[in-house]
UniProtKB/Swiss-Prot annotation:
Gene Ontology MF annotations: sodium:proton antiporter activity
Swiss-Prot/TrEMBL GO biological process terms: regulation of pH
Residue pairs linked by disulfide bridges in the UniProt entry: none
Protein species of origin: Francisella tularensis subsp. holarctica (strain LVS)
Name the UniProt record assigns to this protein: Na(+)/H(+) antiporter NhaA
Length: 383
């Protein structure tokens, strides 16, 4: 990771944090009525019967986040072809660690929440916000070796793959087979353009990807799946910076960290304290998310990394101390934007959403703070 990209990740993390803080301030000020317009102003896209009519909040969650998952898909494709995921030996341990880091928070959440009304939130504490995590890693500078950062990114990639699968399988509320079939045809068209006709014009995939996204929204499947599958269809050429996948990934990166994620954070992190008592911190859904993110994530990921290192099944782990592995396991508990996103998909009750937001913010802050402390002050030999 070059110096300029490190600066981008650092600045992006600070902007993301500032956007979330601003949302909370605005939603608890005289400007709260303007913040509420995110859910009252509707925007239409389409013609005649082919129309998507959603409020601004949904456009952010269904539109901008689809672009974010397009970017994630491009990253994953690159890593599979030429990066760390291209070698099986490099991915087994991070993949298992990511799965454990998904399962443990979910089990903790379910052990605390038995009410059928809130069980649907089991996946909320299972996510990792890679943007925030990279921002903290950038703050730590040379205290975190490049290989250790790569391990965090690899775990986060598998976490993202799991999140996409969870959203597609568990948070699809209704299904139109006709729209889904049409969306699939546009995906197939992109594959044909790539594999058979060898078309390298990015605009072709942008247009076909847009129609795939449109059909996916109309089908009831969440639009992020269209963004991810579109990315997998876009041509990638090794050592060719001008190939569509490389070009789009490089072009999207600043938009993701400086605009899309901050806008998402601002739109979804605005906790309103009006009518909320301190007791909301001790509600089962809030506690399930806090303990899932702060305890479940670190327990699931660190236990796998430490055990595999001890058994010498994790060669890369031999370069790191257990404290370093524990520090990054803590950082993976920063769920923030991804956890908020799943929370919005799972519930629409205002009180539950406020409890979710508080749980996500507290759990993420605890994970980020203690992860930073461990890696910055407790680890004595970062080399």
């Amino acid at each position: 990771m070059g110096a300029s990209q490190k600066n981008q990740e650092l600045i992006g993390g600070l902007i993301l944090f500032s956007a979330a803080l601003l949302a909370i301030v605005v939603n608890n000020s005289p400007l709260a009525s303007y913040y509420a317009m995110l859910e009252t102003i509707n925007v239409k896209l389409g013609i005649e019967n082919l129309v998507i009519d959603k409020n601004l909040m949904h456009w952010i969650n269904d539109g901008l986040m689809a672009i974010y998952f397009l970017y994630i898909g491009l990253e994953i494709k690159r890593e599979i072809i030429v990066g760390t995921l291209s070698k099986l030996s490099n991915i087994i341990t991070p993949a298992i660690a990511a799965f454990a880091g998904l399962a443990m928070p979910s089990l903790i959440y379910l052990s605390i929440n038995h009410d059928i009304k809130v069980i649907n939130g089991w996946a909320i504490p299972s996510a990792t916000d890679i943007a925030f995590t990279l921002g903290i890693l950038a703050l730590l500078g040379t205290r975190v070796p490049a290989k250790l950062k790569l391990l965090v990114i690899t775990i986060a990639i598998f976490d993202d793959i799991a999140a996409i699968a969870i959203i597609a399988i568990f948070y699809t509320k209704s299904l139109s087979l006709l729209s889904l079939s049409l969306g699939t045809l546009f995906i197939l068209a992109m594959i044909i353009c790539n594999r058979i006709f060898k078309i390298n014009r990015s605009s072709v995939y942008v247009v076909l990807g847009f129609f795939a996204w449109f059909c996916t929204i109309k089908s009831g499947v969440h639009a992020t799946l269209a963004g991810f599958t579109t990315a997998l269809c876009i041509p990638f050429r090794e050592n060719d910076k001008d190939s569509p996948a490389n070009f789009m990934e490089d072009s999207l990166h600043p938009w993701i960290i400086y605009f899309i994620l901050p806008v998402f954070a601002f739109a979804n992190a605005g906790i309103s304290f009006s009518g909320i008592s301190f007791s909301i911190l001790f509600e089962p859904i809030t506690l399930g998310i806090i303990w899932g993110l702060f305890v479940g994530k670190q327990l699931g990921i660190f236990s796998i990394l430490a055990v595999f290192k001890k058994l010498k099944w994790f060669k890369l782990g031999e370069s790191f101390s257990n404290l370093q592995l524990y520090g990054i396991s803590l950082l993976c508990g920063i769920g923030f934007t991804m956890s908020l996103f799943i929370g919005v998909l799972a519930f629409n009750d205002t009180h539950l959403l406020n409890a979710i937001k508080i749980g996500v913010v507290v759990g993420s802050v605890l994970s980020g703070f203690f992860g930073y402390i461990v890696l910055r002050f407790i680890v004595t030999n970062p080399s």
